Amino acid sequence: KRFVFPFPVLNDKKITGYILSKYRLKTINDVLSICPNGLYPFAFFFNGALISCDAIKQIGNVDKNFFIAGEEVDYFYRLRAVGKVLTDMNAHHYHPNVYERTWSDLKIYYYTKNTIILNKRHLNMATLRNIFFAVVATFYRIFLHNGWTGIISYLYRNNLKFLVIAIQRGLNGRVGIDFLDKK
């Protein structure tokens, strides 16, 4: 059975090229083939997560400024800064298939902006190349959730303006609820 969220293949520093890694572990057997003990040093939050109270005391709560997209990624990297974060392949939980839902303009805006912020903040990836990949990843996600018509709407309608604003605000590190802000 395939994961709803395939696990990334990690490098020697246990870091993933989170934006567009072409190597993904799509099944439990894929993970077990490289991690036979079943404890993989990566996690998707928050479904099924068991988090130490001590870790929460050290890093605080979820950053609500990562509205709609990215709060789980930010929390993962903050947790990892204070200790190990693992997924136990013996613990199973169900998550509905997220690809059956279309993404709104709001979701696309925050996904784009927050992906850029997270890559700058936690992966030191503020290069033009990585920003380009963040935008490509956004278009890939639009395609997965909304199909070709979704992509076309971002290239030829008013939606392109929102995408450019999301990129600018991501580069500026502007977190928070600001979709309708004019500045």
What kind of feature is each model-predicted range?
Residues 1-59:
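Acidic/His-rich active-site region of diverse nucleotide-sugar glycosyltransferases
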Residues 97-101, 146-147:
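Short acidic, glycine/proline-rich loop/turn micro-motifs
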Residues 106-114, 125-183:
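Non-catalytic, C-terminal membrane-associated alpha-helical segments of glycosyltransferases
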Residues 57-58, 124-126:
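Short helix-loop capping/hinge motifs at secondary-structure junctions, enriched
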